[in-house]
Amino acid sequence: MLQEHFFLSEDVITLAQQLLGHKLITTHEGLITSGYIVETEAYRGPDDKACHAYNYRKTQRNRAMYLKGGSAYLYRCYGMHHLLNVVTGPEDIPHAVLIRAILPDQGKELMIQRRQWRDKPPHLLTNGPGKVCQALGISLENNRQRLNTPALYISKEKISGTLTATARIGIDYAQEYRDVPWRFLLSPEDSGKVLS
């Protein structure tokens, strides 16, 4: 698994790119599911108006962002979808990387079951942050958890591919930060890793 020092960089933009291709792994009730990270978004706490911790705002919900890098920040979006963020940087520097999409690897049948996705397009199984959490069995119970236990971790194992940067999604309120290219996507080189 990735060691703690990997997550302690204060450059969340670069780290959001470096996470692409790494395998995200969960163990829930003894069952393993995993997928390669293929889409991320960077949120740079103090100055980023799209970030929950803009201007060092601290709330009950976003307290996990102030933990040391390598912690999980989970929150609920629209009251129903759980979203996983990887906290980065030193303690009290509220940077995070949102995991937006994965390519399923281990436990794909279990992911389909969790998502109730039988006989539906496979490329839509884990192509959104809420879908990732549902497929991997990630919930608010994982909030503040260190990403170095069998329950939830990121492996050193990595696939390569072509990286694309675009504006982040759903942040029209973020003024001058609305269009910064801090959303990163990986198109894997191995065609066998691409969902059809």
Curated annotation (Swiss-Prot):
Cite the EC number: 3.2.2.-
**Species lineage:** Bacteria, Pseudomonadati, Chlamydiota, Chlamydiia, Chlamydiales
Transcription regulation as a keyword of this entry, yes or no, is no
Q: Enumerate the HAMAP family for this protein.
A: 3MGH
**Sorted UniProt keywords:** DNA damage, DNA repair, Hydrolase
Q: Which organism is it from?
A: Chlamydia pneumoniae
PANTHER family listed in its UniProt record: DNA-3-METHYLADENINE GLYCOSYLASE (PTHR10429:SF0)
Q: Which leading EC class covers this enzyme?
A: hydrolase
Family named by the database record: Belongs to the DNA glycosylase MPG family.
Q: Which SUPFAM superfamilies match?
A: FMT C-terminal domain-like
- Protein name listed in UniProt: Putative 3-methyladenine DNA glycosylase
* Alphabetized CDD domains for the sequence: AAG (cd00540)
